[in-house]
């Protein structure tokens, strides 16, 4: 049995003069929370929550800019101006109050920048080699610009020191320093190109200037991507050269290229379709070959893997960045012997979408108006929740934690709702953790959950509730489609046994996952599948987190026909027993007709609102939710309830068809204020 005193994760680590209180860290990432290019209140509160939660080191400022021609492509921090220093001082004081250390990543994007972002300058690189992902055609960096950028790195590091930070790291992987190291990008024939020693010269000169500006008693690390254009062996050779300079205090090792969407989703930020801790063996091999401390983060989402990495000496500090986006109080729970209560990172990569927000922790990055510590309610209420999908489960969890008397009515034999279908995909099974964690929480809280109970209006009226929350979800939106009786919905396709043979047209009218989960099921069953899309590319809504790349890869492997930009307008039965799907082409306005044995249709969900509408006339608020209060997690305006009345709300897909995060967010912000 692991105790707090013997847990490898809770042992301190000395980095130069800095004593880190445990082995858990959050690595630098672009959270998209800056305001006016600086880490202000929202940004700082996001990181402070992790410090309050017990981790030893939070690194921030992913891709922070040191120069004018490294633009604000990802809403990064601008370290090229002295105006950043007061923000860093407040930030440092805030984090240090909780006993955690604070470091910033500093970099120049090089060719990875966006030439069409202010100030609209040419991008630079060792050689004019275009990056596929960010699409800039860079100019070869001039000797004078090399000197300028080196100076900018030094000044940015000094600003970090002046701001009270404990250290910095520079970023090589895919960025300007790494571009000099990469022989496929660095085609120079001068002293900065050619041999391994020449290609690390720029990195050394940058860090010589940094040391000149910050001195020897400031922690300086190097985020180093293995096999980023170089072989693993040459990467080790480079690391030994860098280590031999005495300029560095640690290596933060990552793996692989990041110059395409797929490479980013596999290497740098491994998604749900990638195994747990995919590059830990590579990082361990790197550590065996160097003398400096080694940090590493890449889908180390669970404590068992993190503990193993430290116990076996594979790493010195373990990065659990996305795990902390899901559960910022992770270390505190470990210390208290309650790690089984930690909200799991399910690997959905939702945090890559627009901001550092978890698919099932809506408080993350919203700390200025949502708390992670759920307070007790001033007055206990009797709450009835109809539906045990993600929204209903979260509503029950929040209400019960606040001390309310909660009952949940669920029509099915198990909890989960539509999420059970979402988790049927071969690489999306971990989504079920969202359900399992909440079911376990409700068991701990002794919530009365009644399965196989289809709620009627009489159930609502007889319960005597003060608050009724409708979380009945949605059903496939086929009603307005002529010939819907000739189609299968995605619910049908994902729950029924696939036909033994025949042809199937799968129609994607939303750009979400569902159509492709169905297509995958039919391909695996050996059917002749074709895809029809309303959008110009598959799974268009999932692109922010890289899932579209997985589906496009799978489609290429399936070798199935794909027709884009066509909208399904009708399905009819043909005389030969097949189904005829009629489409309108959005670009040509032409009518397109396709035949198959089966047609599967994804057009989103329509709210199941019968019970809500029936209950409205008995409610004190007519089922109305004040949006201004709801949007900011404030209490709903008071509506005096008469005898037998209740306050009625609806959340999740029972309100409108959206996603898992929004369903849980609805529940969180409503119930936190009940």
Swiss-Prot record:
Activity profile over pH: Optimum pH is 8.0 with R-carvone and NADH as substrates.
Family: In the N-terminal section; belongs to the NADH:flavin oxidoreductase/NADH oxidase family.
Binding site for FAD: 391, 418, 428
Active site: 175 (proton donor)
Keywords, ordered alphabetically: 4Fe-4S, FAD, Flavoprotein, FMN, Iron, Iron-sulfur, Metal-binding, NAD, Oxidoreductase
Names of required cofactors: [4Fe-4S] cluster; FAD; FMN
Taxonomy of the source species: Bacteria, Pseudomonadati, Pseudomonadota, Betaproteobacteria, Burkholderiales
UniProt entry tagged with the keyword DNA-binding: no
Binding site for FMN: 62, 105, 223, 299
Disulfide bonds: none
Source species, domain of life: Bacteria
Physiological role: A member of the 2-enoate reductase subfamily of old yellow enzymes (OYE) able to reduce alpha/beta alkenes near electron-withdrawing groups as well as perform oxidative demethylation chemistry. Prefers NADH over NADPH as cosubstrate. May play a role in osmotic stress response in situ.
Protein known as: Multifunctional alkene reductase/demethylase OYE
EC number of the protein: 1.14.13.-, 1.3.1.-
Catalytic activity: 3-phenylpropanoate + NAD(+) = (E)-cinnamate + NADH + H(+); N-methyl-L-proline + NAD(+) + H2O = L-proline + formaldehyde + NADH + H(+)
Cofactor note text: Binds 1 [4Fe-4S] cluster per monomer via a modified motif.
Binding site for [4Fe-4S] cluster: 345, 351, 358
């Amino acid at each position: 049995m692991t105790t707090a005193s013997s847990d490898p994760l809770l042992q301190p680590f000395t980095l130069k003069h800095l004593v880190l209180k445990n082995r858990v860290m959050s690595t630098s990432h672009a959270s998209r929370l800056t305001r006016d290019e600086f880490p202000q209140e929202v940004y700082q509160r996001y990181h402070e929550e992790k410090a309050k939660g017990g981790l030893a080191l939070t690194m921030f400022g992913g891709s922070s800019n040191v120069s004018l021609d490294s633009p604000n492509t990802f809403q990064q921090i601008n370290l090229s101006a002295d105006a950043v220093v007061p923000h860093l001082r407040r930030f440092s004081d805030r984090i240090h109050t909780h006993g955690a250390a604070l470091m910033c990543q500093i970099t120049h994007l090089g060719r990875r920048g966006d030439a069409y972002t202010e100030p609209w300058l040419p991008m630079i690189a060792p050689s004019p080699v275009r990056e596929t992902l960010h699409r800039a055609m860079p100019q070869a960096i001039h000797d004078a610009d090399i000197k300028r950028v080196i100076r900018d790195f030094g000044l940015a590091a000094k600003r970090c020191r002046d701001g009270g930070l404990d250290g910095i790291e520079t970023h090589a992987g895919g960025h300007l320093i790494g571009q000099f190291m990469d022989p496929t990008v660095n085609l120079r024939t001068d002293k900065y190109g050619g041999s391994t020693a020449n290609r690390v010269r720029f990195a050394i000169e940058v860090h010589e200037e940094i040391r000149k500006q910050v001195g020897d008693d400031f922690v300086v690390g190097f985020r180093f991507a293995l096999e980023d254009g170089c072989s693993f062996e040459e990467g080790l050779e480079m690391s030994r050269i860098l280590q031999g300079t005495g300029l560095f205090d640690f290596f933060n090792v990552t793996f692989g290229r990041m110059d395409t969407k797929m490479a980013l989703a596999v290497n740098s930020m491994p998604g749900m379709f990638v195994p747990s801790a995919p590059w830990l063996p590579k990082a361990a091999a790197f550590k065996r070959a160097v003398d400096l401390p080694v940090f590493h983060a890449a889908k180390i989402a669970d404590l068992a893997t993190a503990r193993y990495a430290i116990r076996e000496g594979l790493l010195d500090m373990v990065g659990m960045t996305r795990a902390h986006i899901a559960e910022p109080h992770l270390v505190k729970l470990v210390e208290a012997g309650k790690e089984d209560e930690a909200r799991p990172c399910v690997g959905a990569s939702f945090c890559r979408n627009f901001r550092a927000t978890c698919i099932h922790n809506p408080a993350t990055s919203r700390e200025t108006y949502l708390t992670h510590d759920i307070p007790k309610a001033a007055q206990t209420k009797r709450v009835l929740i109809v539906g045990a999908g993600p929204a209903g489960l979260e509503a029950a969890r929040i209400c019960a934690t606040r001390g309310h008397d909660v009952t949940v009515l669920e029509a099915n034999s198990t909890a989960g709702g539509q999420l059970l279908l979402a988790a049927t995909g071969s690489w999306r099974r971990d989504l079920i953790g969202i359900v399992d964690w909440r079911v376990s929480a409700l068991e701990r809280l002794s919530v009365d959950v009644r399965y196989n109970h289809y709620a009627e209006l009489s159930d609502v009226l007889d319960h005597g509730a003060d608050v009724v929350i409708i979380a009945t979800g949605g059903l496939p939106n086929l009603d307005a489609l002529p010939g819907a009786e000739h189609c299968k919905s995605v619910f049908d396709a994902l729950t029924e046994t696939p036909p033994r043979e025949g042809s199937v047209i799968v129609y994607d009218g939303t750009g979400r996952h569902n159509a492709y989960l169905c297509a995958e099921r039919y391909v695996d069953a050996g059917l002749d599948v074709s895809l029809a899309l309303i959008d110009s590319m598959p799974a268009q809504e999932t692109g922010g987190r890289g899932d579209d790349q997985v589906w496009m890869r799978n489609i290429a492997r399936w070798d199935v026909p794909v027709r884009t930009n066509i909208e399904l307008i009708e399905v009819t039965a043909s005389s030969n027993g097949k189904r005829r799907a009629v489409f309108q082409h959005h670009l040509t306005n032409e009518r397109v007709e396709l035949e198959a044995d089966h047609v599967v249709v994804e057009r989103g969900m329509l709210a199941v609102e019968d019970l809500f509408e029936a209950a409205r006339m008995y409610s004190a608020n007519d089922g109305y939710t004040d949006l201004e209060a709801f949007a900011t997690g404030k209490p709903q305006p008071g509506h005096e309830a008469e005898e037998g009345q209740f306050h009625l709300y609806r959340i999740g897909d029972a309100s409108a068809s959206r996603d898992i995060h929004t369903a849980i967010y609805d529940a969180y912000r409503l119930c936190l204020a009940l």
